[in-house]
From Swiss-Prot:
Pathway participation: Cell wall biogenesis; peptidoglycan biosynthesis
Protein name (record): D-alanine--D-alanine ligase
GO CC annotation terms, alphabetical: cytosol
Similarity-based family: Belongs to the D-alanine--D-alanine ligase family.
Enzyme class (EC, first level): ligase
Sequence positions that bind ATP: 138-193
Residues annotated as binding Mg(2+) 2: E275, N277
Annotated residues for binding of Mg(2+) 1: D262, E275
HAMAP family, alphabetized: Dala_Dala_lig (MF_00047)
Gene3D superfamilies: 3.40.50.20, ATP-grasp fold, A domain, ATP-grasp fold, B domain
UniProt keyword annotations, A-Z: ATP-binding, Cell shape, Cell wall biogenesis/degradation, Cytoplasm, Ligase, Magnesium, Manganese, Metal-binding, Nucleotide-binding, Peptidoglycan synthesis
Pfam family, one: Dala_Dala_lig_N
GO biological process: cell wall organization; peptidoglycan biosynthetic process; regulation of cell shape
C-alpha cells in the first residue's frame, strides 16, 4: 500500500450517482471506490449530489472528495467549482480541465492548435437541416463516420454510420443529447487504444478489441466478450511515444492528476486522439484498474494513490 497514515485524509466523501445519463455507471464506480478506500482504513462515506445539497459536505465536516461522478455537472467543471468554493480538496482536474475535457468539440479545437493528431471532423448544431448537412459532410469526410454528442461520455448516443443515407437520423438522435454534434471520420486499420494516466505511475497502454462494431456503452460496461490486451502488442518505442503524446494531449487541456486519453491507429500506425476522460470509470469493467493490475497495483492501492494527490 501507499504507506500514508489513513488519518491524514480526514473525512472523505465519495461523490457518486448524480443526474447525468451515466448515473448507473457512476453508482457502480463509486461503490467500488468507497470499498477500496475503506479497505485502506480511510474514513470514506458515499455522497450523491442528486439527493443531497453540496453544502452538506461542509456542514458535515468533509475535508476532501473522491469524484466518481461521470458526465454532466460531475465532469464539466460545475462540481469542481463548487468544491473549490467550499474549500474541499478533490480528485482529478479542476474547473478548466474538466470543462474542456468533457467538451469533445473544444477539445479537438485545442488539439488542432497544439499539434495533437485528431480525426478530421465537422460539427452540426441542433435544429440544422440534417439532410443537407449530411450530404455536405459525407462529401467532405466520406464514410464510415462516428456521430457523437459533444458533451456526453461512456459512448452515450454514439453511432457508427456506414452510409450517407443513415447520417441524418444519427444526427437527429445525437442532437437530443447535446446542441452540438460531432461528426468524425472513422480511423480504420490499426485498432483502438487507451492511455491511463495516474500521477507518476507508468501504466501500460491497453488495446481494446470489442466484439461489436466499436467500443460502445454495452462493450464498456455490460459485455463480457470485449478483449483488453495488456501488453498492447506495440513495440516498446512506439508505446512510449504514444504515452508521451497522450500525456501532452491531457496537459494541453489543463487536465491534471489522473484520467484517460483514448486514441485510434490507422493502417500505417499513426495515432489519432479521440477524447480524454477526466473522471474515468472505476467499475470492474473499467480500464484504469486493469492497467494498474497489470503492473501489480491493486484496486485499493490505486484509489488511495489517486486520493493522495489531494494531499499535495
Amino acid at each position: 500500500m501507499s504507506g500514508i497514515d489513513p488519518k491524514r485524509f480526514g473525512k472523505v466523501a465519495v461523490l457518486l450517482g448524480g443526474d447525468s445519463a451515466e448515473r448507473e455507471v457512476s453508482l457502480n464506480s463509486g461503490r467500488l471506490v468507497l470499498q477500496g478506500l475503506r479497505d485502506a482504513g480511510i474514513d470514506a462515506h458515499p455522497f450523491d449530489p442528486a439527493q443531497r445539497p453540496l453544502a452538506a459536505l461542509k456542514d458535515e465536516g468533509f475535508v476532501r472528495a473522491f469524484n466518481a461522478l461521470h458526465g454532466g455537472y460531475g465532469e464539466n467543471g460545475q462540481i469542481q467549482g463548487a468544491l473549490d468554493f467550499y474549500g474541499i480538496r478533490y480528485t482529478g482536474s479542476g474547473v478548466l480541465g474538466s470543462a474542456l475535457g468533457l467538451d469533445k468539440f473544444r477539445t479537438k479545437l485545442v488539439w488542432q492548435q497544439t499539434g495533437i493528431p485528431t480525426p478530421p471532423f465537422e460539427t452540426v448544431m441542433r435544429g440544422d437541416d440534417y439532410a443537407a448537412r449530411a450530404q455536405d459532410i459525407a462529401a467532405k469526410l466520406g464514410v464510415p463516420l462516428f456521430v457523437k454528442p459533444a458533451s456526453e461520455g461512456s459512448s452515450v448516443a454514439v453511432e457508427k454510420v456506414k452510409s450517407a443515407d443513415a447520417l441524418p437520423a444519427a444526427l437527429e438522435e445525437a442532437a437530443k443529447h447535446d446542441k452540438i454534434v460531432i461528426v468524425e471520420k472513422s480511423i480504420e486499420g490499426g485498432g483502438e487504444y487507451t492511455a491511463c494516466i495516474a500521477a507518476d505511475l507508468d501504466l501500460p497502454l491497453i488495446r481494446i478489441v470489442p466484439a461489436g462494431e466499436f467500443y460502445d456503452y454495452h462493450a464498456k460496461y455490460i459485455a463480457n466478450d470485449t478483449q483488453y490486451l495488456i501488453p498492447c502488442g506495440l513495440d516498446a518505442a512506439k508505446e512510449a511515444e504514444f504515452k508521451r503524446i497522450a500525456r501532452r494531449a491531457f496537459d494541453v487541456l489543463g487536465c491534471t492528476d489522473w484520467g484517460r486519453a483514448d486514441f485510434m491507429l490507422d493502417a500505417a500506425g499513426n495515432p489519432y486522439f479521440l477524447e480524454v476522460n477526466t473522471a474515468p470509470g472505476m467499475t470492474d469493467h473499467s480500464l484504469p484498474p486493469k492497467a494498474a493490475r497489470a503492473v501489480g497495483i491493486g484496486y485499493s492501492e490505486l484509489v488511495v494513490k489517486v486520493l493522495s494527490l489531494t494531499l499535495d
